[in-house]
Amino acid sequence: MTYRMIVSLALVIISMNYLEAQDFREKPENVYLNVSFVVVQPQAEFSRNVTNNGYGVDFDGGWYVYNGPVGLGLNLIAAQYGNFSRKIPYSYFSSLVSLTETTQSTIFIVNPYIKPTLRFGDFSFHAKFFAGYQLLETNTTIKNDEQENNQQEEDEPDYIAKSKVSSDSAFDYGVGLGMRFPIFRNLEKGPIFLSLEMKWSKGGEAEYLNASKEGAIVLSDPAEGPVTTTLNPDRSKTDLFNISLGIGF
C-alpha cells in the first residue's frame, strides 16, 4: 500500500472525527455512514493475473426504509492492486538529476445495494445484495523528488506529467455479510460504531494491466536508443472477495 493511500485513509479518519465532533442530533435515526479500510482479494481467473491483494478505502452509506429492517444504500470502493516505479534521468546528457516514473493500477467499484438487517438495540447483523460497476485503470505519473516526498507547496502541482495507459470496465453483482456494534457512546450525539463486512462479487470480463506483474510492463534497452515501453494487459472476469473494517455513525 502506497504512502498516498495511507495519507488518504488518515484524512478519512480525521474527517470522521471532525464530523463526530459536530452536533448530530438533527441526523435522522434511520441514516447510517461507514468509512473503512478495505482489502480486495482477486478470485478465480482474476487471481491468476493479479496475485497480490489490493488495498484502499470503502465508503458506505444508506438509510433504513421507514426505520425498518431493510436498508437501501450505496457502496464506493477505491483500491490499488498494482505498482511499478523506476528512476529516470532528467536529461539524456546527465544522470545527476533524476525523476521518478510510477505506474499504478487501481480498481474503482460503485455498488447500490439492498440490506436486510437484524438489529438488537445498537448491535446489528446484516446481509447485502448488490449490483454495480467496476472500473479498472492504470495511470503513469512522473514526479521530481519534492513531489515524490510530498514536500511541494500547496499551490504547486502533484506531478510533472500524467497519462492514463489502460482503462476498462465491467458490471458486477454479489452478496455480503457484516455487523456493526458500538465502541464509544455519547449521550447527546449517539454511538460510534465499529463495522466489519465481507463481500463476494462476480465481475464481468475486462481488460486490465497489473503494474506489479512481471512482464506486464516491458522496457527496451536504453543502450539501443530512446526507451520504448510495451504493455501486456490481461483479460478475464473480475471476481473479488473484499474485507472491510472501519468506523461509522
Model-derived features: positions:
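Cleavable N-terminal export/targeting peptides
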Residues: 1-29, 248
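Short glycine/proline- and aromatic-enriched beta-strand/turn motifs that initiate or cap beta-hairpins
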Residues: 21-71, 242, 246-249
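Residues that define the transmembrane beta-barrel architecture of outer-membrane proteins
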Residues: 29-31, 51-57, 104-110, 123, ...
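Residues on the lipid-exposed face of transmembrane beta-strands in outer-membrane beta-barrel proteins
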Residues: 35-39, 57-63, 78, 110-118, ...
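Extracellular loop and loop/strand-boundary signature of outer-membrane beta-barrel proteins
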Residues: 43-49, 94-103, 157-166, 228-233
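Predominantly the C-terminal beta-signal and adjacent terminal strand-loop region
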Residues: 178-249
